[in-house]
Amino acid sequence: MEISQGAEESLEIMGDPNVISSITATVTDRTLVISSKEDLPANSSLSYKLTVKNLTGVLLNEFGVIKIPTCTTDSLELTVNGPGRMDLGEIKVTDLKFVVNGNGSIEADSVTSTKLTVTSIDTGAVTIRGGSTVDLILELGPGFFLGADFKSTNVTLNMNGSGSAQVWSVEKLDATVNGAGKVIYFGEPTMSMSISGGGQLSGGGNK
């Protein structure tokens, strides 16, 4: 599925007509729900193009890939449950939330925000290749956060388990690591840390 913003809202479904006939799309309380009346064949291939005026949240359950090339809005929450993946392009959101439950992933080329909250308490992964935020808040388990080139003014990190994180903090880093997790930070922030259970916190140099 590819999601874009536009003046007119629309949903286009492409694929085998016999498979499309089992797909339902309903709107309840301003939430679009796309589901299937029955189990789809393993070899079925469907693609979706969704255009919305204002995007405030996306929930991906189980398998699948959702692409959002660009998005500009005040508040947005993106959630992946299971092994699915979200591929993001240039995202400009004041208050942004990423939630990964399971072994899914969220990957972004660029994020610009005032506040970004990332929650990934399972084995999922979040990757941000560029952009900046004022406040980055991370709640991590055994998964991964890769943001060495994502500039954050302040970083608050709470890691429980054997996860791995790379962060770039300019002013302040508040890190708590419980377990065998590993954190690499870039920049020269003022630091407050609590490490137990064999965890590691090390500097990767200034940027």
Please state what every model-predicted region is:
Residues 132, 137-170:
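Glycine/small-residue-rich hydrophobic helix-like segments
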Residues 1-81, 88-99, 110-117, 129-137, ...:
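Acidic (Asp/Glu) and glycine-rich low-complexity loops/linkers
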Residues 56, 64, 84, 104, ...:
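Residues at the loop-to-beta-strand transition
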